Each structure stands twice: as C-alpha cells, then as structure tokens.
C-alpha cells in the first residue's frame, strides 16, 4: 500500500506536465494503472470478480 502522502501528491496538478503520473485511486499503486478506470490491474480484477464493474465478465474461449 502506498503512503497517504504519495496518494495526495499524485492528485495535485504538477508544475510541469512531464511530472504527472497515474496512481490507482483505490490502493495508490503506481504501476499497471488502467487509464480508463483509474485503478490498477489488481484492484480491477478484484472489482470485476465481485461484479462491481458493469459489463465486465471473465473471458473464456
């Protein structure tokens, strides 16, 4: 889990656009963040399994 200070820091608008980076809105993880949902792959998978993301279901082929 990320520190609270890092979560707050990520929400602020940076002075230079190159300093901006995505961070998961739920857990604060900086890697593997899905831009469309603004959450990391781990939280995305958890929410999808719980049925909290509409229209999302496990793929099977």
Curated annotation (Swiss-Prot):
GO terms for cellular component: cytoplasm; small ribosomal subunit. Its cofactor is Zn(2+). This is Small ribosomal subunit protein uS14. Belongs to the universal ribosomal protein uS14 family. Zinc-binding uS14 subfamily. Part of the 30S ribosomal subunit. Contacts proteins S3 and S10. Binds 1 zinc ion per subunit. Zn(2+) binds at residues 24, 27, 40, 43. One of its GO terms (biological process) is translation. Transmembrane segments: none annotated. SUPFAM superfamilies: Glucocorticoid receptor-like (DNA-binding domain). One of its GO terms (molecular function) is zinc ion binding.
